[in-house]
Each structure stands twice: as C-alpha cells, then as structure tokens.
Amino acid sequence: MTRRILPLSSIDRRAVLTGLVGSALAAPHLTSAQTAARAPVPLVLRARPVRRALRPGAPDADIWALEPESRGPLAFRRGDTLAMTFRNDLPVPTVLNWHGLDGAPDTEPLLARAPVPPGGSDTVSLPLSRAGTLMCDARLLGDGGARATGALALSVGDDGLTADRDETLLIEDWRPGADGHPTAPGASPNGAPPIYSVNGQPARDIPTRPGERLRFRFINGSQRNVIALKIDNSAVRVMAIDGRRAEPFPARDGQLVLAAGTRIDAVIDVPASPGSTAQIHISDGRTTLPLSRIVSSGEPLRTTPLPPPAALPSDGLPDRIDLRTALRVDLTIDRIAGANWIAPASFDSVGAPAFGVKRNRAVVLALTNRAAVPATFHLHGHHFRLLDRLDDG
C-alpha cells in the first residue's frame, strides 16, 4: 500500500518527511503494451486561489484549490496514459503530490523536476498501470503556508468490481484561523474545531434507490488528521485499501478508520425497503459529527439481495513477502532536520541515500519516533505492507 499513518514525528511542524525518496530505493519503471497502444488522455489541472463556502450558510472562505479544467469526475481506465498539464496560479512554487501511483511518476516531482513557479506550467506523462483509487494534492511544499489547499480524487477502473453506482467521497478538514479563513497545516488553528467538506463542498445527502449496490471510494484528504467513519444500519464490506485489493472483510460496526491520505473502497447494499436512511458520522478522536446521509427513495432496483462481492483479481503484487533474507533498516525520526531527514523544499537527489539495496530484495523498515507529535509517512513510488510483531510477510 502506498501510504499509511505511522506514529512518526515531523522534522519540524511544517515539514513532511520524504528522506526515503531518491537513491534510497530504486523506483521501478512501469511499461505496458496496453498503455502504449492507446492515445494519451489529456488532463489539465490548475492550482489557484478561490473563495468557497465550506458549510451551509457560512460566508465564502479563501482557500487554495487544485481543480481540473474539465467538469465531471476524474475517472479513467487501467492502461490509460495521462498527458497531464499542471498550471500553477498560486503565488508560491508548487509540485503535485500523488498518492497511489507506481514508480517513477510518483517520484519525479522530487527527483527529476523543479517545482512549478508562480504563473508557470509543466506537462508530464502518467501511465495508469493499475486500477484503484488515487489522490493528488499540491501541498508537498506548502505546509504552514499562507492558505489551506484542497486535494483531488481520481479513479482508475477495470478492477472487476461490479456495482450499480460508483460514489467518491473525498473528505477534507479545514480549520478557521483568526480571520475566519482556513489555515494551512502547521499554522496555529487557535483551537478552532475543524470544518469537514465532501468533494470540496458542504456535505450533502447521497440519494439512492432501494436495493441498489453502491461502491464507495472513501478518501481522507486531510493532511494530518486520522478520521473514523461510521455508517449506521449498513453492512460495509471493504474491498481495497490505498488502491490495492484486499481480501474482502466486513467493517466492524460499519466503521472505517482512515489515516491521512488513506483510500478505502467499500461496498454497501441499500435495503430493499423504500425510505431507508443511513447516517454517516465522522470522528477525529475528539468529536463526532454527522457528515452525510445515504437516503433511498423510489422503486426498488431489486428485491432479492445480491451475493457478497468476490475478491478483486490480483493486481500483480505478491500475496506474501519472504522476509527471511530481508534487509532491515532502522530509521530514527526526530524534530531536528539533519542527515537522515530533509524537508521537501530542500530535497536534493544527489545527496547521500538513507540506505542502499539490490533490486528485488525485500526491505523491512523499522521506524522509531523520538518526538511528541505524529506525522504522515509517504514512501514515494513504492507500495509497502504494514507489519505487526507476529507478521512473517
């Protein structure tokens, strides 16, 4: 899986840890005859200041948004290659940060490309070799900056999961500052409680038909917060985590826990009786709030329940990892930027690697947090498996 929350400390409160990027691990180059046979799919993304209402009845707030120039969901097919142009209309240099891409496309923003300057643009080719749920943001260099910045959700289809409808819920938190406008992570929130948005807008009801099978792509677009979602009166079956298939399992009590950047694909079958409502609650460990509702109406789509969905087909990643010959690397993280950890804005790919390893050898990273605050850990360009003390791979 591409991204997990670990109890790690940031270098300082403004830096995202990216010291493992670069020579530390050789990112695989992905090729596909299917990808090469298709014409590239154009995609234009723009980062710009906007004013947007984040909750019903509230005045518009100043935020920085990452938006596609075309309307509609960003849904693509496995095997597509995106001809992606990024235009930076923000007053600061910016790079795009991808969650779920494989190999070189995910590492290029730090390894091979300069940040896009204010008013500048850049065009890259992004092969979508695997199906799954992706996220993109423009926050890598901006923690503690002038404004809070939103994220984007992308879906890559053809993973074998059949549902009547595909719903994406990109959940983001915004913390109003003293001026009433959301502050960027790393800036003082003045103790203000968060405002949660769904797909960049105030939360809304999700209309359904009785008997409908829904595929939900739940995404925690927060930069730091761990959130829990609880869906009342619903059997929630998890199918994929962080864009990678999982052995299907029911969410306990209809609850999903998502670290910052985590994506969970789940299936929910709407009851066949008309007029049912399922409340979606969100909790950040301090408060629990209503986020949205699944509301059914109209004629039933079907009256006989569907069988549970089968597991998604293999995505090419191994079911087991042989750890007997794995290289073990111990990494200690503290609040002081030093030889081991470098803030993204200062990253230099010609610097000394954190460690070296031969291609195709398994690596076990043992990370120790020496500070008092948590941080997100993003291993660019690689999937990894979170191990417990009894895990043998």
Positions of PLM-derived features:
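Extracytoplasmic/lumenal soluble domains of exported proteins with redox or metal-associated functions
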Residues: 34-136, 144-145
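Extended terminal and domain-junction accessory segments
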Residues: 33-48, 144-176, 246-374, 381
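N-terminal edge beta-strand
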Residues: 57-75, 194-205, 338-359
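Asparagine-centered strand-capping/turn motif at beta-strand->loop junctions
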Residues: 86-90, 219-220, 367-371
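N-terminal secretory signal peptides
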Residues: 1-11, 22-24
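Histidine- and aromatic-rich segments of cupredoxin/plastocyanin-like copper-binding domains
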Residues: 105-118, 127, 171-173, 178, ...
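Short, hydrophobic/aromatic beta-strand segments
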Residues: 93-99, 225-231, 375-379
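Short tyrosine-centred short linear motifs in exposed loops/low-complexity segments
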Residues: 79-80, 120, 128-134, 211-212, ...
